[in-house]
């Protein structure tokens, strides 16, 4: 990929919310150049700190639903179009974001977590398991038994959706009424 395409990719990733570590891994641009680009696009310095590193986050109820949606979109793009990994990733993330925004919801899966998810699949840390009830394919730990797997949509946890934010109130207990 030539330098112009590298810069365009970096700008696109920054606009979508990529962290500096993602940019460094996916482009060949120098760290200094990426920081300058980030400041130009976002108007501030890139955030510091470690990237998410736990695969367990992707297994919890709501993140699992969103991660599964995103990863299935990504796989579909890769398998049907044959476009390169990073382009498929950007297209899949845009489609995921578009799909979630149809319900006026905030995306649970940020771009950096989506990128980490793909890396976990590539490293054989995560896999897709088919739900025995609905037939959907959901993110699960690699090498976990898949026979009789039931997804979080078919069998949500008892407190699913009963958060302060979902209730629109300060007290969670009022959701139970």
Describe every region a protein language model picked out.
Residues 1-12, 16, 21-177:
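Long, charge-rich, low-complexity intrinsically disordered regions
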């Amino acid at each position: 990929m030539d330098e112009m395409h590298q810069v365009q990719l970096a700008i696109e990733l920054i606009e979508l919310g990529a962290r500096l570590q993602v940019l460094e891994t996916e482009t060949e641009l120098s760290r200094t150049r990426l920081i300058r680009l980030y400041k130009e696009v976002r108007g501030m310095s890139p955030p510091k700190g470690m990237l998410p590193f736990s695969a367990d986050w992707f297994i919890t109820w709501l993140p699992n639903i969103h991660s599964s949606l995103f990863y299935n979109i990504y796989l579909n793009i890769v398998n049907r179009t044959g476009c390169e990994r990073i382009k498929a990733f950007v297209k899949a993330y845009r489609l995921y974001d578009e799909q979630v925004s149809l319900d006026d919801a905030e995306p649970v899966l940020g771009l950096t977590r989506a990128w980490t998810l793909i890396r976990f699949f590539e490293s054989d840390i995560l896999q897709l398991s088919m739900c025995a009830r609905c037939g959907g394919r959901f993110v699960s730990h690699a090498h976990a038994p898949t026979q009789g797997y039931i997804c979080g949509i078919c069998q949500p946890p008892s407190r699913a959706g009963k958060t302060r934010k979902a209730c629109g109130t300060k007290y969670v207990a009022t959701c139970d009424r």
